[in-house]
From Swiss-Prot:
PROSITE patterns: ADH_ZINC (PS00059). The record marks D148 as: Important for catalytic activity for the proton relay mechanism but does not participate directly in the coordination of zinc atom. Its EC number is 1.1.1.103. It comes from Shewanella halifaxensis (strain HAW-EB4). The active site is at T40, H43. Belongs to the zinc-containing alcohol dehydrogenase family. NCBIfam families: PRK05396.1 (NF003808), tdh (TIGR00692). This is L-threonine 3-dehydrogenase.
Length: 341
């Protein structure tokens, strides 16, 4: 089968002829229709320090996808051949305290599809049936293929009450932009998103952000004043992993504010903890999606009218995968879809 593999320990991704995966007793065999390129895939392409320390070579990569069930193990229940599915990319152990307690997203033994095990950039993917999510008929393949990053946005945004609140999002990558759309949809008042990438700030504005602020040109405090905000942001969503962005968030949070952190700093990050203490801030780390509450919320949000389709800016056939990676690496894109049909 066709597949995209991290074939060598250097910059790049390669098209290979890979063996079709075998189906275990509790597995689904999925024929891939569409995949999306994640920021993680770009890290793997670039072969940065994280990738060098994490990714086995060679390995098929990719973890954002939608496809059709074409085979299943003899123990699988609840799925039929022809079901349209996406899937949770974090494969959990089922045995640790968090898994047994129903907090599977906090499994300490998580293995990532396309990160620690064979991924979805292939004509066929095998995953445990437990990890598959049936896609409702009224949700398109395009949207279903980005449920993984959309889930990061939903999990982060819905960590705290947003109704009538003022929200600051630092980092206008695709996940931050989708989070802005979620915040507005569920009833936040002002949703301000910051970055230095004009292309993505414009995209965030289209997706519902009250203000998209280029912090290289405009002060966040001036924007707050223009919006009539006198006491700071109630909720912060840190999506960038950039220390200066987090420092700015701490400066502009209201007392008693709540921060959800999804962005991963490149290394240790020093902050002024006195601001956290004296403001009484709550900081929550976010990793992945809640299994599977976030997945049901994603489907329900779209079915209730949330439109995240503008975040998808490019489509390529799988044979044009290099153009897709070039678009993602340029920073001048939203989500990039690769078509396998």
């Amino acid at each position: 089968m066709k597949a995209l593999s991290k074939l060598k320990p250097e910059e790049g991704i390669w098209m290979v002829d890979a063996p079709k995966p075998e189906v275990g007793h509790n597995d689904l065999l999925i024929k891939i229709r569409k995949t999306a390129i994640c920021g993680t895939d770009v890290h793997i392409y670039n072969w940065d320090e994280w990738s060098q320390n994490t990714i086995p070579v060679p390995m098929v990569v990719g973890h954002e996808y939608v496809g059709e069930v074409v085979g299943m193990g003899q123990e699988v229940r609840g799925f039929t051949i022809g079901d349209r599915v996406s899937g949770e990319g974090h494969i959990t152990c089922g045995h640790c305290r968090n898994c047994r307690g129903g907090r599977t997203h906090l499994c300490r033994n998580t293995s990532g599809v396309g990160v620690n095990r064979e991924g979805a950039f292939a004509e066929y993917l095998v995953i445990p049936a437990f990890n598959a999510f049936k896609i409702p008929d009224d949700i398109s393949d395009d949207l279903a293929s980005i449920f993984d990053p959309f889930g990061n946005a939903v999990h982060t945004a819905l960590s705290f009450d947003l109704v009538g609140e003022d929200v600051l999002i630092t980092g206008a990558g695709p996940i931050g932009i989708m989070a802005a759309a979620v915040c507005r949809h569920v009833g936040a008042r002002h949703v301000v998103i910051t970055d230095v990438n004009e292309y993505r700030l414009e995209l965030a504005q289209k997706m519902g952000a009250t203000r998209a602020v280029n912090v290289a040109k405009e002060k966040l405090e001036d924007v707050m004043q223009e919006l009539g905000m006198t006491e700071g942001f109630d909720v912060g969503l840190e999506m960038s992993g950039v220390p200066s962005a987090f420092h700015s968030m701490l400066d502009t949070m209201n007392h008693g504010g709540k921060i959800a952190m999804l962005g991963i700093p490149g290394g240790e990050m020093a902050i002024d903890w006195s601001k956290v203490i004296f403001k009484g801030l709550i900081i929550k780390g976010i990793y992945g999606r809640e299994m599977f509450e976030t997945w049901y919320k994603m489907a329900s949000l779209i079915q209730s009218g949330l439109d995240i389709s503008p975040i998808i800016t490019h489509h390529f056939s799988i044979d044009e995968f290099q153009q897709g990676f070039d678009a993602m690496r340029s920073g001048q894109s939203g989500k990039v879809i690769l078509n396998w049909d």
